[in-house]
Amino acid sequence: MSNIFSLSVSEIAEKIRNSDLNSVDLCKSYIEQINKFEKDVKAWAHFDKKLLLEKAEEADEHRRSGKSVGPLHGIPVALKDIIGTYDMPTECGTVLRKGKTESQNAEIVDLLKSAGALIMGKTNTSELAFLAPPETRNPHDYSRTPGGSSSGSAAVIASHMAPLSIGSQTGGSVIRPASYCGVVGYKPSYGLISRNGVLRTSYHLDHIGVFGKTVEDVALLAKVLIKKDSYDKATCLLYTSPSPRD
């Protein structure tokens, strides 16, 4: 299914909704890319092929049963390895957290799952999102850097190892790797997307960002994530309705 990589995520999602494509086959296409390129690109901190295919089969069965589906139903999404999850490690790029999981998902992970997305795994990041860079290489030239700190999140898009990914930015960590890897990276305004459950570097500078092949793709992903969260006060301030004028 090599032609799948020429489609936008919106087109893929529509094909899944119309039963012209199933999530298992979609995920297998990305697994093939991972098998081809991961040994050179080194974008993944954690990837569980078996778990992904199990979740894909569940998504297909859900759709076949006639139940309603979300905007990202059956679409695999990669997460930067500072985004908390309870069912896979969140190591934050450091040996100090090797194998550690969280007691619950980050808010954005729950939003992704509610939209029908499948969590693929974790992508490599600079240590603690600001120290030593990871081993990830630029997919276009293995001798060059993919940029950081969301190195793996940009690299998986550029190498077609994932259709969508999530990163973070405190001082350029979305827009820089997006530029270096030739993909679309979107860092929304402060407070639009909850950081609850994500490694904090700076309360006033940390942002969640998204990566994809096209502006349409990142807009679709961002729309799912933009939501008020009472556990991230920055979103509460942004979404507070202004007082009516006298």
Positions of PLM-derived features:
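An N-terminal boundary/leader segment
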Residues: 1-54
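Predominant activation on well-ordered alpha-helical scaffold segments within soluble catalytic domains
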Residues: 10-13, 28-31, 53, 57, ...
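Short, conserved phosphate/pyrophosphate- and ester-handling motifs at nucleotide-, phospho-/glycolipid
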Residues: 19, 80, 214
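Immediate post-signal peptide segment of exported/extracytoplasmic ligand-binding proteins
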Residues: 59-75, 241
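A short helix-breaking turn/cap at a secondary-structure junction
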Residues: 187-241
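A short, hydrophobic C-terminal helix/tail in secreted or cell-surface proteins
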Residues: 242-246
